[in-house]
């Protein structure tokens, strides 16, 4: 099962949006996209960045934001036989894994930075994703990451 959400990050004088897709099996970030607009297209780009066959995915969970609950995402999920799961309205606890991942992402990698471009944010996000993935694997195999 996969979970996802969007968050915003200050870039220059604007807000940029980050969409992360997390594998619930091991909490690995397996998909991501960044952009200036909070849209279904941003979610689609994150889905397309997943490095393995979507036919292996059984469930896709998100909140009820219009960028997730729409025809474009419905068509993608249906094409791969993926079951949709939506949080109850007004209940962030239903998407707790995504919420806690974003909290850690912002505390560890965003709040101490000042981003001037989307490219800077993309580089930092990719480094954060690599670190988190490496850290998870290190914890599973009991050694520390050497980055």
What are the residue ranges of the model-derived segments?
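Charged DNA-binding/catalytic regions of mobile-element recombinases
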Residues: 1-147
């Amino acid at each position: 099962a996969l979970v996802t959400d969007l968050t915003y990050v200050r870039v220059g004088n604007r807000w940029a949006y980050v969409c992360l897709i997390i594998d619930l099996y091991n909490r690995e970030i397996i998909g991501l996209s960044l952009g200036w607009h909070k849209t279904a297209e941003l979610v689609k780009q994150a889905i397309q960045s997943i490095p393995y066959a979507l036919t292996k995915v059984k469930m896709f969970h998100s909140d009820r934001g219009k960028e997730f609950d729409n025809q474009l995402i419905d068509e993608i999920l249906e094409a791969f036989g993926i079951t949709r799961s939506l949080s109850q309205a007004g209940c962030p606890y239903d998407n707790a894994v995504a919420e806690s991942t974003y909290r850690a992402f912002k505390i560890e990698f965003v709040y101490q930075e000042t981003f001037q471009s989307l490219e800077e944010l993309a580089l930092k996000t990719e480094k954060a994703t690599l670190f988190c993935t490496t850290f998870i694997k290190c914890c599973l195999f009991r050694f520390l990451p050497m980055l």
